[in-house]
Amino acid sequence: MSSNTVNQRVNFASTKNPLEYPDFLEVQLKSFQDFLQLDTPPEKRKNEGLYKVFAENFPIADTRNNFVLEFLDYYIDPPRYTIDDCIERGLTYSVPLKAKLKLYCTDPDHEDFDTVIQDVFLGPIPYMTDKATFVINGAERVVVSQLHRSPGVFFGQSVHANGTKLYSARIIPFKGSWIEFATDINNVMYAYIDRKKKLPVTTLLRAIGFENDKDILEIFNLAEDVKVNKTNLKRVLGRKLAARVLKTWIEDFVDEDTGEVVSIERNEVIIDRETVLEEVHIDEILESGVQNILLHKDEPNQSDFSIIYNTLQKDPSNSEKEAVLYIYRQLRNADPADDASAREVINNLFFSEKRYDLGDVGRYRINKKLNLTTDMDVRVLTKEDIIEIIKYLIELINSKADVDDIDHLSNRRVRTVGEQLSNQFAVGLARMSRTIRERMNVRDNEVFTPIDLINAKTISSVINSFFGTNALSQFMDQTNPLAEITHKRRMSALGPGGLSRERAGFEVRDVHYTHYGRLCPIETPEGPNIGLISSLCVFAKINELGFIETPYRKVENGKVDLSDNGLVYLTAEEEEEKIIAQGNAPLNDDGTFVRNKVKSRQDADFPVVEPSEVDLMDVSPQQIASIAASLIPFLEHDDANRALMGSNMMRQAVPLLRSEAPIVGTGIERQLVRDSRTQITAEGDGVVDFVDATTIRILYDRTEDEEFVSFEPALKEYRIPKFRKTNQNMTIDLRPICDKGQRVKKGDILTEGYSTEKGELALGKNLLVAYMPWKGYNYEDAIVLNERVVREDLLTSVHVEEYSLEVRETKRGMEELTSDIPNVSEEATKDLDENGIVRIGARIEPGDIMIGKITPKGESDPSPEEKLLRAIFGDKAGDVKDASLKASPSLKGVVIDKKLFSRVIKNRSSKLADKALLPKIDDEFESKVADLKRILVKKLMTLTEGKVSQGVKDYLGAEVIAKGSKFSASDFDSLDFTSIQLSNWTSDDHTNGMVRDLVMNFIKKYKELDAELKRKKFAITIGDELPAGIIQMAKVYIAKKRKIGVGDKMAGRHGNKGIVSRVVRQEDMPFLADGTPVDIVLNPLGVPSRMNIGQIFEAVLGRAGKTLGVKFATPIFDGATMDDLDQWTDKAGLPRYCKTYLCDGGTGEQFDQAATVGVTYMLKLGHMVEDKMHARSIGPYSLITQQPLGGKAQFGGQRFGEMEVWALEGFGAAHILQEILTIKSDDVVGRSKAYEAIVKGEPMPQPGIPESLNVLLHELRGLGLSINLE
């Protein structure tokens, strides 16, 4: 684009960063795309997102397996309304989700039942806009990604009160029961199922198939089997028994209920385990008839496994059957019906795919942790997993392994939007499949179709409650583009399934070494959420398992691979133990290190090593920070706490009337604007065909193939938003920065405004600042402003507020919008139109009527006589009351827009007119579709000319164009393209691809026409779509122009915030030697203790830039040095460090000391005094205490609290104090008497009893105490 639309910047980066920034919204957009997989043909869809949810819930069969409902495919239709329509009308921007379902019968008795394939509507699903937001009930919302504990196995330790270390292993699945293995102070290992049921771990091992002690001990290679005979027994005297010696026999008894003979196996313990074998035992063993006995092995690591022996001692069971029974009783507190049902319960706990799911992540983590090679498809626990976990736990006890660090990012993963939606869908579909099954069972004998089985409300109610009430679905912060993009890249540890503020300790909130390049160590809120909400780093990505990855360059033999192949994205786990060089380590052209020692990072350590030892290198010094922190120039010179405030306050910067990009930037500003999607950008290469204040049209370049398969014109029109309101009542008002005939490339930014200038982020203004005290007015961070800033509207912003009023039908009758309001003067309604809505351009003052509405009064129903009289004389005033919308006490502004939406209220004639109109609309649609199909058939004929069909099939697999036949126009005319398989029509791959694209574009265009038809019909028959129960809705938009004034909050980018304390006349401000007055005076004492020296660097470089007309980019940790500053100040002819002697504006004399005078980028923040200032004389009172309410929203009073009372007592001001505590507060009688006295000019009456005393008396009487005032 031309240089007049792009800011050229001098870049100080020493590392010319070859790695492009990733798309900053990829986190959200890619996740949602993977959830729907709309661009992928059904047969190639991955088993994730929505497809996976369908695959897991279908096929659904009835209880007798007679009918089966199978899932074939899903698709979506275009949305009915545009995003803007939805925002205006308070609707949800959603698309209809439809599924192709197949219902068939397997029962031979139902021969008459044909297989049915139907497209079934499953409800609307909110659709993500290209800005990665959702429009829910007219408001833009963002679904924040959640950081939670990854499924898998975790090893931890705790310390018992007596000082013993207790170890535990916990297996966390995606779905199913938690199981924990833990040791106790007696060195016994227990398994806890779902955190409550406790059983010895050996009981669990028996139940899963290691039936006897021998099997259990052999797992750990602890026992030796000895065959029982006298010789062998004599040889092993003195050794310990590893397992009990059991005598087994069968006992028969008669079951009294059935009369059957039942056999039962009985066990008797002859010798207990851990007994040392002596002579006396030999005969006992021989008599018991045991074939083998088990002895401990004499091995050095024997003692390591003492916990297994101790656990066997505690084990109440001796066989699998007993173990299964024991576990069943623990879980259910009852006896099982039979052995099989008990086994099934245990099997369902961990080994059933329906009930238990580790997920890909859980399996991956368990394999990685325990060095297993189990297949990734095995999503349930295996016996091997349980054994390996027990073995690892034993290693922990013996200090041969380490416990896991729960805050390590390999143990935390991200749930993105797509996954959260999948989980909600799974809940909705599970509910729906239950109702489908029930309906199938009920309708056994009748003929039914998939549509009869499905209730679309089930899914949409779950999805709606997720978007409406879930803690992670948030009202988007839309103060400026940075606030939007940061909100979408936020990672929250809160929310369902996450932590809670109260329980989160310091460790979870702390910065961890694995956050490097993944989560920003700087940007997090101050207050109770600190450390629980973080922001994704600039280069970070989230992989398919949900772990955060960051890029590095490979280093081999001391040489950095600077090619694209040398780039690797690593998770925290893959980065373990690696030695990583800094991003700004100096390199030679061939990629070798300049210095023979390299500063590097290895986990939490920072060794200085030889180049040959380095494994990886950072891609950029900015890798460590998030977008907001990367926007702070000279961040490396600021204290982290102030940088945190700086990055948080940039999100609160109000878009100004005229935006101005910073002189000193960091080079990331352009990418941020492009990726925020708040401006109009070119979708491809092309030429600007037309441009004015409201419209841009671009003619895009297209290849022949693209032109051929498309049904859209190459000319695309964009509407430029004007004075559009954001969620935070800021203004989006864009203007074009391209010219007619100009060539544009893909990604070029075509507009500016809403905190952007020439395609760069522009949150504030470059102001001339002096660091010096000024008459005490800038004490404690206060700011002194030059009046010029106010006069020239440098820091003026426009805020748009929307006010709406709804018309409903009440029990008493219909409400009505009108300018004819009872008991209101003509003066008050002079600006209202016939619908009672204020005219555009009217100035609004507090108390003015903005929308006039009357509503039927409800004292009593009128009698028939009254009704008759009213009908004759038309007396309406008596039965309605004024329900108009009036301006609140602080509202002043200008009406810039108004809208009225209404449902159609039908009378007979209008119904007839509609009847005539609807067929015309249908005919118009039919002819458009016929034209469209004609073009399609013509193009298909061109494509398939001379080619032979390879067999074109429909969804049922039936051939509709036979294999080997030639394609003909009549064949194509008769095809239903919506139910055709699009793969391999011909033997040529290129033609097949073109056919596929052509037919897909045809279907897309057809669906758009269909949606338009539905929209038109809806508009005629029903009118505007409005939320339920509302007949009309009027909206008024009021713009307020806010100049900066005393009490407004301002800040720089380094956490240097303050309140404007005085606006000083231009001639009274300190001025430079050439007579230029400074714009703003800041207190120099705000710098040293805050340690944000970056602001001084910025001021010095900014002034050099302003003098020379140059803009700079100084990337963080790689920016301008002191030498660079000196060089540029010398070039600009400024003193070193811009230490300048100023003159006093009042006297004209020069000050004694030089002060730093520079140009700093200052922001005006959203905390404006006009929104906060509030005063009241009389107003509402609390119902019970009769004291004035509190807060501006309630038009409340100021609390005169305990300490204020002490102050008046200290002065002895008894009368004032009495007045404040009685008639000015809650003495109800006194209030009215005082009013009377003021009106009549009489002296003030004596105050009465405050209401709060009466409340106290009532409370005491409520306790049964008889209390009276004498």
UniProtKB/Swiss-Prot annotation:
| Nucleotidyltransferase among keywords | yes
Q: Which InterPro entries match?
A: DNA-dir_RNA_pol_bsu_ext_1_sf, DNA-dir_RNA_pol_bsu_external_1, DNA-dir_RNA_pol_su2, DNA-dir_RNAP_su2_dom, DNA-dir_RNAP_su2_hyb_sf, RNA_pol_bsu_bac, RNA_pol_bsu_CS, RNA_pol_bsu_protrusion
What are this entry's molecular-function GO terms?
DNA binding; DNA-directed RNA polymerase activity; ribonucleoside binding
Listed CDD domains: RNA_pol_B_RPB2
Domain of life, per lineage: Bacteria
Task: Please provide the Gene Ontology terms (biological process) for this protein.
Answer: DNA-templated transcription
Catalytic activity reads:
RNA(n) + a ribonucleoside 5'-triphosphate = RNA(n+1) + diphosphate
UniProt family annotation: Belongs to the RNA polymerase beta chain family.
Q: Give the protein's function.
A: DNA-dependent RNA polymerase catalyzes the transcription of DNA into RNA using the four ribonucleoside triphosphates as substrates.
Name recorded for this polypeptide: DNA-directed RNA polymerase subunit beta
Taxonomic lineage of this organism?
A: Bacteria, Pseudomonadati, Bacteroidota, Bacteroidia, Bacteroidales
